[in-house]
Curated annotation (Swiss-Prot):
Belongs to the herpesviridae UL24 family. Keywords: Host cytoplasm, Host Golgi apparatus, Host nucleus, Late protein, Virion. It comes from Equine herpesvirus 1 (strain V592). InterPro entries: Herpes_UL24. This is Protein UL24 homolog. GO terms for cellular component: host cell Golgi apparatus; host cell nucleolus; virion component. The keyword DNA repair does not apply. The lineage of its organism: Viruses, Duplodnaviria, Heunggongvirae, Peploviricota, Herviviricetes. It holds the Pfam family Herpes_UL24. Disulfide bonds: none annotated. It is found in: Virion; Host cytoplasm; Host nucleus, Host nucleolus; Host Golgi apparatus. May participate in nuclear egress of viral particles. Plays a role in the dispersal of several host nucleolar proteins including NCL/nucleolin and NPM1. Since deletion of host NCL/nucleolin negatively impact on nuclear egress, UL24 supposedly acts on this process through its effect on host nucleoli.
Length: 272
């Protein structure tokens, strides 16, 4: 009986890990599509649309995704950084995502899901606190937005999105993105199919076109550290100062503001 319970627990753990990995890969593709087309898909809309409108994402200077970010005591599943300008005073948004997977989605108020919710909110609170302590110096206003997401293991449908109160911190958005990238410990694999485009013209043999693929590049996987497996998916890299490494290594006290940060985000996209 105990052995069967152990096997069941292991199989559930493996299923959860597989779902996490599939969702990571889907996020990479969905965010690349949203950046290119200015429209969020069904998965990303409940996660991003309230903070960063899709049309604004399309014109953002830099957008990056990092997975399994090692902050020491906590490891948020995904961190997305969006940069809206150049320089140390550029504004940005940093979305911390904690992912919880569900085998059954009909009832979202079961005891196990309530435990998952409480644990996820605690993890997000700790992740924000740890990230705020290690921000690189800078004067740009950056919104830290923690989000808890429940996902169905079958179909990877987003079942529920819960948000913690966002915070406004002051840092360098470009250096922050690089800092988070170096802490990433997982990168979704690149599919061989995604590197090809088939010719569909009538009477022409289907084949891969490397020139056309270069015009619409597939998001590349850049190792975060050459000597380790840690990597980050940088979809649309922003220009980073040459002294990024040195600047990121210096940590200064961070001023945090809780005064209506969502209103500030909305003001970024209001007509001038």
């Amino acid at each position: 009986m105990k052995r069967r319970q152990r096997l069941t627990a292991r199989s559930r753990l493996r299923a959860g890990i597989r779902c996490h990995n599939r969702f990571y890969n889907a996020m990479v593709q969905d965010l690349a599509s949203a950046k290119r087309n200015g429209v969020y898909g069904e998965r990303l809309a409940p996660l991003f649309s309230e903070l960063v409108p899709a049309e604004t994402l399309k014109t953002a200077l830099g957008v990056s995704l990092a997975f399994e970010v090692n902050l020491g005591q906590r490891r948020p599943d995904c961190v997305c950084t969006v940069q809206f300008g150049k320089g140390s005073d550029a504004k940005g948004v940093c979305i911390l995502i904690e992912l919880k997977t569900c085998r059954f989605s009909k009832n979202m108020n079961t005891a196990s899901k309530n435990l998952q919710r409480k644990g996820g909110m605690r993890q997000l609170h700790d992740s924000c606190r740890l990230l705020a302590r290690t921000l690189p110096p800078g004067s740009g206003e950056i919104v830290l937005a923690p989000v808890l997401v429940f996902v169905a293991q079958r179909g990877m449908r987003v079942l529920r999105v819960t948000r913690l109160s966002p915070q406004v911190v002051y840092s360098n958005a470009a250096v922050l993105s690089c800092t988070i990238s170096r802490l990433a410990e997982y990168a979704p694999p690149v599919s061989a199919k995604s590197t090809r485009r088939r010719c569909v013209a009538k009477g022409t043999k289907a084949k891969a076109f490397s020139t056309k693929a270069a015009a619409e590049p597939v998001p590349s996987i850049t190792p975060a550290q050459p000597s380790a497996a840690a990597a980050v998916v940088s979809l649309f890299p922003a220009a980073v100062p040459a002294n990024t490494t040195n600047a990121a290594a210096v940590h200064q006290p961070v001023a945090v503001s809780h005064v209506n940060p969502l209103a500030w985000v909305a003001s970024l996209f209001s007509p001038k």
